[in-house]
Curated annotation (Swiss-Prot):
It is found in: Cytoplasm. The lineage of its organism: Bacteria, Pseudomonadati, Pseudomonadota, Alphaproteobacteria, Hyphomicrobiales. CDD domains: YqgF (cd16964). The keyword Nuclease applies. This is Putative pre-16S rRNA nuclease. It comes from Rhizobium etli (strain ATCC 51251 / DSM 11541 / JCM 21823 / NBRC 15573 / CFN 42). Coiled coil: none annotated. One of its GO terms (cellular component) is cytosol.
Amino acid sequence: MTVLTIEEIAEILPPGQAIAGLDLGTKTIGLSISDLGRRFATPRPVIRRIKFTIDAQALLDFASAEKVAGFVIGLPMNMDGSAGPRVQATRAFVRNMEQKTALPFIYWDERLSTVAAERVLIEMDVSRAKRAERIDSAAASFILQGALDRLSLLARSAGDEFSA
């Protein structure tokens, strides 16, 4: 497993496989999945965190079932662009996953993804209790959608036939 940039992963991803989006929290891992054309991110049920080995296996089971080619994981930078303790925890999680999978990871700036996800859920008139259940996967979808949009832009600028 390696950590790649969005430009690097655009070069190596095989067609017809999905990408998973992850929002790593202390209690849950928010999940989302792309369609096979890599245009749309869809939220999936969260993984309730127990301990790393169990969390990792649940994530790998999800990846296998969904034929995932790689992961986009939110990097929770501070608003000033500095890396805080949550960034360190995210990087440690990815380093630990290195022992478990050969699938690549992309770090994606997730600043304000949870805020944006919550606003959408509020606009949809989702109750506070339901928002709490859905917020992490909705944030994972925002993270993944940002990466998918960038991949689409890279494909268009490269003249890729899959960008239409």
